[in-house]
Amino acid sequence: MIQIEALPAFSDNYIWLLQDTAKRRCAVVDPGDAGPVERWLAANPEWVLSDILVTHHHNDHVGGVERLRQLTGARVCGPANERIPGRDLALDEGDRVDVLGVTFQVMAVPGHTLGHIAFFSDQPATPILFSGDTLFAAGCGRMFEGTPEQMQPALARLAALPEQTQVYCAHEYTLSNLRFAKAVEPTNPHVQQRFEDVTRLRAENRISLPSTIGLERLTNPFLRTAETLVKQKADEWKGHSNNSHVAVFAALRSWKDTF
């Protein structure tokens, strides 16, 4: 059985720690800083770090990779089309990778970066998704390299995963994302309830993750481009009609960039 724990890093990053409690083996996702992982391993000396999964090349996701690889000999698995330090296994759309006895499907999800990948598995009792900086709780990543024509379909693919899928994204952006979601859909009761719930969690310094695909479908404006009110708000922002899901998404993303 795999357990998943968040190791906070920097101001708002989460390094996800996967633990095989039976074999005392673990893996991490997007270790932008080696420190939190080193401290956990030092406190749990009987555990072995076997794998490092990377979603994209930004330094706050790969900054600790080489040191951890040198310290532990862990296998580094990352996107084939990006420069990932110490990468041992290059992964692209349709590939599969076994980690701690769990098989993950690799999904190409370009937009935030061109080579960005996500890791999905439906083998655990509850499916799990490591979405990096593509899909956030109630939001999505900025398009630093890709285009709306790439990112909107990528998000739609993630939204089509089973609704019970637990979403482990890489940043604690949920509250600010929900403020934007409220501006887009001020009458959406699910958004309002989630905003209240997350406000309480963060006031207690508690993590707001994981999310679920089902909850994202109800509250994430970037997955709700087919909703009439969402389109109307996007049209108001742009000053003209947006006649495709991609156009609505692009309008929302440009609005969020300045929100």
From Swiss-Prot:
Keywords: Hydrolase, Metal-binding, Zinc. Pathway: Secondary metabolite metabolism; methylglyoxal degradation; (R)-lactate from methylglyoxal: step 2/2. Binds 2 Zn(2+) ions per subunit. The keyword Hydrolase applies. Its EC number is 3.1.2.6. One of its GO terms (molecular function) is metal ion binding. The keyword Hydrolase applies. SMART domains: Lactamase_B. Zn(2+) 2 binds at D60, H61, D133, H171. CDD domains: hydroxyacylglutathione_hydrolase_MBL-fold. Pfam families: HAGH_C, Lactamase_B. It catalyses: an S-(2-hydroxyacyl)glutathione + H2O = a 2-hydroxy carboxylate + glutathione + H(+). Its cofactor is Zn(2+). InterPro entries: Clx_II_MBL, Glyoxalase_II_hydrolase, HAGH_C, Hydroxyacylglutathione_Hdrlase, Metallo-B-lactamas, RibonucZ/Hydroxyglut_hydro. One of its GO terms (biological process) is methylglyoxal catabolic process to D-lactate via S-lactoyl-glutathione. Zn(2+) 1 binds at H56, H58, H112, D133. SUPFAM superfamilies: Metallo-hydrolase/oxidoreductase. Thiolesterase that catalyzes the hydrolysis of S-D-lactoyl-glutathione to form glutathione and D-lactic acid. Belongs to the metallo-beta-lactamase superfamily. Glyoxalase II family. Monomer. This is Hydroxyacylglutathione hydrolase. It comes from Pseudomonas putida (strain ATCC 47054 / DSM 6125 / CFBP 8728 / NCIMB 11950 / KT2440). The lineage of its organism: Bacteria, Pseudomonadati, Pseudomonadota, Gammaproteobacteria, Pseudomonadales. The gene is gloB.
